[in-house]
Amino acid sequence: MARVTTGITSSHIPALGAAIQTGTSDNDYWGPVFKGYQPIRDWIKQPGNMPDVVILVYNDHASAFDMNIIPTFAIGCAETFKPADEGWGPRPVPDVKGHPDLAWHIAQSLILDEFDMTIMNQMDVDHGCTVPLSMIFGEPEEWPCKVIPFPVNVVTYPPPSGKRCFALGDSIRAAVESFPEDLNVHVWGTGGMSHQLQGPRAGLINKEFDLNFIDKLISDPEELSKMPHIQYLRESGSEGVELVMWLIMRGALPEKVRDLYTFYHIPASNTALGAMILQPEETAGTPLEPRKVMSGHSLAQA
């Protein structure tokens, strides 16, 4: 049967994609960010770590959806998803190849589990989906695995609650485990961490909130899932609510997990950046060395 072997989190800051495209990923500003991702890139190439399929949880930024249609949860069931034109032409990255059989199976299972999914048989994917792929897989001619895009509305109020997202992750795991094909499946939760793009608090970053969120995501995700929207807004900025998508990833893993790697960097553009590798405790691999990396212009200690 298929199984969820790994959960990965990653910010999806669009400037990361621009740094790759402009050849500035190794300069003084961006170099530490890409250095922090290198252990994940190396890890995923090791035998047994490369997924057959990634369920990639992200939010669309007015590319596939706009104010005319705002699905709370959607799932891409197509064969192929093209990079979206976000105003400067599509990112020069490979098309995303889907896994329709698994995607339809998950959609059916989730709907029968009382999650009202929007099924997308045609959809372009923006930086929310493609930047994490670039940060972890680099610049291949083709992405090395199939990807099921899983958009979540965190742009237009009301977004789903953390509790609902955590429960959705659990249902995703059950759906995957009932699929008969032998597949290594990852669930990636993207977005965040603390940031605010507009208004009087534009540029807000809250390191204390972010690091506490990381710790709770590992040790007590159920309690973390009870955090109300207003707390995300107050403490992590208007865009910090993207972190509910990390709870979908965490819900797809069992209660006890092992954190293989955690990277935190501030600032990346105007955002706090986080990336993690989590695996079920019973089947987890060896943690990376170092296990936790912190960097950035605003962090005195590495």
UniProtKB/Swiss-Prot annotation:
Its cofactor is Fe(2+). It catalyses: 3,4-dihydroxybenzoate + O2 = 4-carboxy-2-hydroxy-cis,cis-muconate 6-semialdehyde + H(+). It comes from the Bacteria. Its EC number is 1.13.11.8. GO terms for biological process: catabolic process. Keywords: Aromatic hydrocarbons catabolism, Dioxygenase, Iron, Oxidoreductase. GO terms for molecular function: ferrous iron binding; protocatechuate 4,5-dioxygenase activity. Disulfide bonds: none annotated. It holds the Pfam family LigB. Responsible for the aromatic ring fission of protocatechuate. NCBIfam families: PRK13364.1 (NF009901), PRK13365.1 (NF009902), PRK13366.1 (NF009903). Composed of two subunits (alpha and beta) in a 1:1 ratio. This is Protocatechuate 4,5-dioxygenase beta chain.
